[in-house]
């Protein structure tokens, strides 16, 4: 979550 890369957050958004 905190250490997760920006790609992860980007995917969430997309979802």
Swiss-Prot record:
Record keywords: Glycoprotein, Glycosidase, Hydrolase
EC number, UniProt record: 3.2.1.117
Post-translational modification: Glycosylated.
Primary enzyme class: hydrolase
Reaction equations catalysed: (R)-amygdalin + H2O = (R)-prunasin + D-glucose
Domain of life: Eukaryota
Keyword Hydrolase: yes
GO molecular function: amygdalin beta-glucosidase activity
Keyword Hydrolase among record annotations: yes
Assembly notes: Monomer.
Protein name: Amygdalin beta-glucosidase I'
Organism: Prunus serotina
